């Protein structure tokens, strides 16, 4: 299926260079001087087996009304509205600027899907800038070098995933179908019934993280035996190993997984298969433990793994290993919490457990924390409480009007758990912007105490009984 992609971003981040790279010709003028591109330019692009229309746009700038820059911005905004997908480009070497933040907010409010890419990452440059890009709230940034053609494989994967989603005739219908499937899977779900854990079914937990952070050592400590091979060499564990275990009379299915590296470092065929096996373990788990090494800096790959867990709808717990080797634990913990809040805004309040897998200190806190996250993941909120909350939320902050008409939210209901999923009903559901949906999700998380779990929120259109009468009259 053909689709249209608009490359957007502030001036001089490499939009025209990427445009030329994708169309295979130097159709767009490229120079180091900001603002070279003034008019939108379209071309037919090919990437692997994908064919699509690409739009090169003028650099987004803050500008006074009536100026040339303001007219250029209007043209860019029209391109965004015309596109099926936006590719927001930032300069990783320069880091995230106030303009980047400003325009990411604009794009979050737009109904057009967005892929975030960090350009000028050749030779490992711009690592700090890529980390900063997480605070834009647009997911994991793709590292690119438009000039050298690096990172196009990651871009292809993202575009191919988007193209699959376009196979539905209508994007809104696709959301409705997905919600209907989830409702069918949860037939008989009653949000007003208290959650009662199924103690007969095993609690499924996957332990994942970068290589050599101590995953197998932690599993051995929990089991009380040297079940898993461990050592200082990174990558000893090759498969996702499932282990049946019992904790305080409750059955647990525990997965020790292969270390996940960033894709550029995954070269051996066996290691690629190991990573795929780890991804399957994440999808089968109910709670995912991301294990960090307290002695190493927080890396982009950790954020990428957390983003994957959120997308898969699993409960999340951050565990920091080798805590006995930290000189200033309170300061390190404070910085870690701030980094998580800033870089993972989509999962606020993720619980953190600190421990030493080698000595066993702090490991007694792990399973109770996993059980709490599992309870949050299964949370049920009574419909009456939900609607009282929504009335208060709307009274504090009304949805923005659309086309000069107010957007009224009728009611809200929880349609499933695992993870908590809610439907908000409105006669103008399509006009509720992404920013307002995010406001509702944050409110749900804070009010009903749902840390460490993804929250799904769908807008559903209510039928207007007078609409048919107007058509007949």
From Swiss-Prot:
It comes from the Bacteria. PROSITE patterns: G_ENGA. GTP 2 binds at residues 209-216, 256-260, 321-324. GO terms for biological process: ribosome biogenesis. GTP 1 binds at residues 9-16, 56-60, 119-122. Residues 3-167, 203-378 form the EngA-type G domain. The keyword Ion transport does not apply. Keywords: GTP-binding, Nucleotide-binding, Repeat, Ribosome biogenesis. Residues 379-463 form the KH-like domain. One of its GO terms (molecular function) is GTP binding. Signal peptide: none annotated. Pfam families: KH_dom-like (PF14714), MMR_HSR1 (PF01926). The keyword Transcription does not apply. SUPFAM superfamilies: P-loop containing nucleoside triphosphate hydrolases. GTPase that plays an essential role in the late steps of ribosome biogenesis. Associates with the 50S ribosomal subunit. Belongs to the TRAFAC class TrmE-Era-EngA-EngB-Septin-like GTPase superfamily. EngA (Der) GTPase family. HAMAP family: GTPase_Der. This is GTPase Der. It comes from Parvibaculum lavamentivorans (strain DS-1 / DSM 13023 / NCIMB 13966). The gene is der.
